[in-house]
Amino acid sequence: MKIGILLGSFDPIHIGHIAIVSKVLNEGLVDKVLFLPAVQNPWKHRKAVSVDLRADMIRTAMYESGFEMNQFNIEIVSRQNKDGNYYTFDQLEALKDIYDKDIEFVILGGTDTVKDMSKWYRGEELLKNWKTVEISRPGFSSEISDMSITVSSSAIRNLLRNNKIPLPWITRGTWEIIEENRLYRD
């Protein structure tokens, strides 16, 4: 079985993420997609919404979009490094302990993300030991060239801060979780 690992904050999940999952599953690039939400991105100073709430938003958005449980999973790996950070390298290594040895993992990342991975904690080792599939982002070319998604989680958060409704860029269920918990209003 080949599992695609979709890295990101998913703060919040949006239609771009859902389109990526649909594309890689429909094209047979992977058999299942595993969301690996960042516990806390060391590059971002803004504190993310709790990882549990983000997992609820992911689960809700995926079900609302017609995906079944056997097509995706959400893994919250909070393996903290000795310096107190949660690095992608450590999270990915933890997955090897959780899943069967015969699973083939593929990192699904935006072209900009994959390009910057070498700068990450143990990034060269990560790129050497993990296969990647690049997904196009505006201004970049990639293996999946027709996936240029112009929506971003930060744009959605900005809409919410300005009391705008971010539909149709998020699912209705995601919107309800955001409203119920008064998220992104700061």
PLM features: what roles do these ranges have?
Residues 1-186:
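Nucleotidyltransferase catalytic core that binds NTPs
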